[in-house]
Amino acid sequence: MAESVDHKELSESNQEELGSQVMAEGPGESQDRSEGVSIEPGDGGQHGEETVAAGVGEEGKGEEAAAGSGEDAGKCGGTDEDSDSDRPKGLIGYLLDTDFVESLPVKVKCRVLALKKLQTRAAHLESKFLREFHDIERKFAEMYQPLLEKRRQIINAVYEPTEEECEYKSDCEDYFEEEMDEEEETNGNEDGMVHEYVDEDDGYEDCYYDYDDEEEEEEEDDSAGATGGEEVNEEDPKGIPDFWLTVLKNVEALTPMIKKYDEPILKLLTDIKVKLSDPGEPLSFTLEFHFKPNEYFKNELLTKTYVLKSKLACYDPHPYRGTAIEYATGCDIDWNEGKNVTLRTIKKKQRHRVWGTVRTVTEDFPKDSFFNFFSPHGISLNGGDENDDFLLGHNLRTYIIPRSVLFFSGDALESQQEGVVREVNDEIYDKIIYDDWMAAIEEVKACCKNLEALVEDIDR
């Protein structure tokens, strides 16, 4: 018993020495040494199991040591396999994620940072361009103001245009003032050069609005009414009725927003203006809707302001989008009692459970309306439908308000329809070409089959 105990203590000391040697040596040597360990026949079954367990533990330690040595080698960058992985991940099929730049070689990474610095400088120049362009827009807005003011006066019957101002040559495109002067035609002649002057009115008789014919027709109507003994009361509307309502309803994006209960209010619009921010203020533009005094709300002016992104963020200067709208704010509408078209009021009768008394409770629910466009809550890029709202504000400022008469007359709609028809025709044309090509290919295939059949017959 004493010998077996001494032998067991000796084997345990040998295992500890062997484990310390494995930690000091490489994985290959530890594996060879572990394979060289033998079990003596006189040790007994218990000693054999302990030796096998020690061998398994030594192999695990060897694997951990090998992994540790591999990490150290990777940090030092001394293997040939690591040199092959220096290529960008984007070039070997990996997704371009945030760690892509970190995976690039040091020199390439420095060049990318240099490009980012150049991009930041370009964004600063773009921001400066936007501010100067806004100043130019402000300058020309003052030049447009007399024209827009006369438009307002004509719409609201403040000013009646003269006969000369109503002469409009509708068939002329790109008509310049130089073409309104007299043009000189030179025709060859045997006796010499004969100069014939062409009047500027030639070819435009059908384009003019003939006031003389209208006066004659009115005189005939008056005489007919006098002879018949009946008075003819013709409507003589002032200005252009429902001008802005018609303009807004002819805008595709605004059509679903305008409800029937909105139309009586929109008929009271006298003008819609675009006001640019003053010098020194943040870049923005404001849409101003001017109304007549009415029974619906106390406001005579409803506004919506769009603030433009004109400065770079210090923490992230790169996602600069140029003339992008950063956020928008509306205004509060002071509705008269019972006239709020953006809310639906429901009255409910409630009975008390104990006392049996009845009371009437009113509850308001939001309702679709054009006037939700003036919601006072600011809309930023984190909103849900901000892109549609920003696009609508941009179109109102750039296209709809400056060219309102074209939307009223339908000319803008015709141009949009022509664009759609052109696109459809292009698609139809492409389909015809494709069908012709496919038919030609099928004919060639049929000819080839016939030739193959003829060749087979000849061979037979």
Curated annotation (Swiss-Prot):
Coiled coil: none
Motif (Nuclear localization signal): 346-352
Keyword annotations from UniProtKB, A to Z: Nucleus
GO cellular component assignments: nucleus
Assigned protein family: Belongs to the nucleosome assembly protein (NAP) family.
One Gene Ontology term from the biological process aspect of the record: neuron differentiation
Tissue: Brain, specifically expressed in neurons.
Subcellular location: Nucleus
Record function comment: Acidic protein which may be involved in interactions with other proteins or DNA.
Molecular-function GO terms, alphabetical: chromatin binding; histone acetyltransferase regulator activity; histone binding
Amino acid composition bias (Acidic residues), ranges on this chain: 213-223
Source organism superkingdom: Eukaryota
One Pfam family from the record: NAP
Region (Disordered): 1-87, 213-238
InterPro entries reported in the protein's UniProt record: NAP-like_sf (IPR037231), NAP_family (IPR002164)
Compositional bias ranges of the Basic and acidic residues kind: 1-11
Protein name (Swiss-Prot/TrEMBL): Nucleosome assembly protein 1-like 2
